[in-house]
Regions:
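C-terminal catalytic domains of large/alpha subunits in multi-subunit enzymes
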Residues: 1-104
């Protein structure tokens, strides 16, 4: 879910004085259960040859792929209109702006 949040929701916005507009989680957009797709987790064991017991970190793996996959899917859908979104998060406002810029 962290990667989906990065791709579609999470953004630090600041006012003209440089103060954050969202200073609590009540104001900061994060995906919740209503926005969560069904996720099926598969495990594949690939021990690291560089550590004593083959262990590796796991925290980053779920956050790295989703923004790229979602971005590619959105841009694939926009391709026929000559539009592209190249900034995260991918919001409806940014998609509409990309379509307008492309003259679609």
């Amino acid at each position: 879910m962290q990667g989906i949040g990065t791709a579609l929701y999470e953004e630090m916005a600041f006012d003209e004085r440089g103060q954050p507009l969202a200073s609590t989680f009540a104001d900061y957009l994060l995906p919740g259960t209503a926005e969560s797709p069904d996720i099926r987790v598969l495990h594949m064991e690939t021990p690291s040859p560089y550590t004593r017991f083959g262990q590796k970190g796991i925290g980053e793996s779920g956050a790295i792929g989703p923004p790229a996959a979602i971005g590619n899917a959105v841009n694939d859908a926009l391709k026929e209109f000559g539009a592209e979104v190249a900034q995260l998060p991918i919001t409806p406002r940014r998609i509409v702006a990309a379509l307008e810029e492309a003259g679609a």
